[in-house]
């Protein structure tokens, strides 16, 4: 298969398949030579902050001289973003080659797996054959039943901020969701967690039951260009008032690795934190346009706090998926804006712009409907010369807007 055929094939694989669980993935990986058993992982779960935490960790390890794989989801502009080594996306040719090989083994051995499990298998084989020293592995959804949890062990299991999302699969309370996330911890292993005060006792109890050495990150104090953690000041390139606390988790991850002999220096830590880029996390793509992929209530609250910290007039461009808690999210973020431009994407799951408008219409906030995201952005920019335009509500919308700026 060529690159285009490989991408088409990946997207043709069912999102879910039976039997549920990882039995077929384990079978597939066995026939691939179990590459995951020959790799070292930092395994990252959580509702919010996984990608940023993974990106900062990977950047620090790369600077420290480790060949570092990074597996994340979803992608914003090109599929290749999901599989990276030392910050470089997998090439089109490599992706086509590995998809073709894994597809052949899967079909030959009748080890059919879901789309995400298939991509996970592709990444394991790629990272192993490219001789990665360490892989930063982001959970797709949940933890316990996630395809990434097929790994036997990790150097560090990481629990980022936990909140309500994917409730139809993970549970209707943060307590239930926390238990799912904790499923990535391994007997006798090492774990680091975001403070997660609401479910701290659940995380502690689970860690104790597995004899896991658990560290909760302490409080990070934001500064103008970074943050202070444990009386030491660090630089930080990622914007957003929520990023210093994610960075504190990263510092505890590196501390845990150093206890295992990795010897990452303070200089490499500071360099990594000051050179990390991570798309669509309070990312300014121009002097007036910021994009943020937050799509659950905790992510939206964090975005709201970051927008208010700018002390500028705000105009929103918003789209959301129907399977999210969209009413709560829209009602939370809209009051920060002088006006809202409701838009939508050409996706079955996408909420109509009219529904967004209806929700905002009762809030006495000017709202305009533009079904085309590009038009919505331009109209938002034209609405006020001095305002900041925030594109939010969906990572898919963020990806569409980033493409516009790359074309420029």
Predicted regions and their residues:
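A glycine-rich beta-strand to alpha-helix segment
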Residues: 376-406
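Residue-level signal for inorganic ion chemistry
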Residues: 10, 47, 68, 136, ...
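Nucleotide phosphate-binding/pyrophosphate-handling subdomain across enzymes
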Residues: 37-38, 134-137, 145-158, 162-166, ...
């Amino acid at each position: 298969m060529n690159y285009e055929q490989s991408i088409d094939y990946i997207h043709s694989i069912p999102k879910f398949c039976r039997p549920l669980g990882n039995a077929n993935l384990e079978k597939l990986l066995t026939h691939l030579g179990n590459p995951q058993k020959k790799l070292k992982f930092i395994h990252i779960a959580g509702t919010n902050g996984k990608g940023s935490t993974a990106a900062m960790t990977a950047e620090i390890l790369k600077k420290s001289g480790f060949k570092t794989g990074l597996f994340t989801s979803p992608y914003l502009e090109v599929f290749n973003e999901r599989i990276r080594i030392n910050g470089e996306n997998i090439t089109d040719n490599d992706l086509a080659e590995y998809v073709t090989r894994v597809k052949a083994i899967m079909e030959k051995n009748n080890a059919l797996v879901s789309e995400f499990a298939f991509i996970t298998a592709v990444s394991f084989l790629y990272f192993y054959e490219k001789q990665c020293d360490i892989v930063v592995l982001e959970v797709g959804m949940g933890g316990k039943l996630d395809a990434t949890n097929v790994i036997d062990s990790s150097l560090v299991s990481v629990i980022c901020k936990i909140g309500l999302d994917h409730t139809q699969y993970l549970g209707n309370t943060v307590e239930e969701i926390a238990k799912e996330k904790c499923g990535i911890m391994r007997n006798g292993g090492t774990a680091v967690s975001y403070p997660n005060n609401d479910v701290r006792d659940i995380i502690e109890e689970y860690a104790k039951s597995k004899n896991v050495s658990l560290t909760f990150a302490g409080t990070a104090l934001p500064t103008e260009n970074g943050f202070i953690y444990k009386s030491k000041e660090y630089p930080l390139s990622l914007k957003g008032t929520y990023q210093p606390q994610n960075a504190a988790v990263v510092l505890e991850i590196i501390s845990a690795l150093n206890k295992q002999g990795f010897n990452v220096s303070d200089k490499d830590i500071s360099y990594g934190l000051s050179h990390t880029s991570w798309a669509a996390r309070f990312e300014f793509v121009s002097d007036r346009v910021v994009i943020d992929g937050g799509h659950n209530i905790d992510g939206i609250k964090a975005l709201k706090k970051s927008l208010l910290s700018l002390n500028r007039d705000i105009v929103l461009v918003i789209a959301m998926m129907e399977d999210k808690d969209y009413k709560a999210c829209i009602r939370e973020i809209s009051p920060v804006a002088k006006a809202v431009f409701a838009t939508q994407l050409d996706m079955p799951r996408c909420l109509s712009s009219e529904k967004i408008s209806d929700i905002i219409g009762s809030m006495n906030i000017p709202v305009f409907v533009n079904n085309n995201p590009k038009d919505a952005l331009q109209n938002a920019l034209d609405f006020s010369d001095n305002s900041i335009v925030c594109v939010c509500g969906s990572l898919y919308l963020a990806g569409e807007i980033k493409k516009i700026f790359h074309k420029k």
